[in-house]
Amino acid sequence: MNNNNVYSLNNFDFLARSFARMQAEGRPVDIQAVTGNMDEEHRDWFCKRYALYCQQATQAKRLELEH
């Protein structure tokens, strides 16, 4: 794997985490618009990461509200 690909994945991961946090805060996120220009491989990877981070953010928010 070349360095450009690693940086690209890190950037996509950061974006997926950021959009998930926005979603958990109640801000609408149009994931179709976000991923619209991605090729299928990157879109699939991004959506899986986004779903994971949405789940984590929702759990964290729920725990925060319990305490």
UniProtKB/Swiss-Prot annotation:
Belongs to the GlgS family. The lineage of its organism: Bacteria, Pseudomonadati, Pseudomonadota, Gammaproteobacteria, Enterobacterales. Pfam families: GlgS (PF08971). InterPro entries: GlgS (IPR015065), GlgS_sf (IPR036295). This is Surface composition regulator. The gene is glgS. Major determinant of cell surface composition. Negatively regulates motility, adhesion and synthesis of biofilm exopolysaccharides. One of its GO terms (biological process) is negative regulation of bacterial-type flagellum-dependent cell motility. NCBIfam families: PRK02922.1.
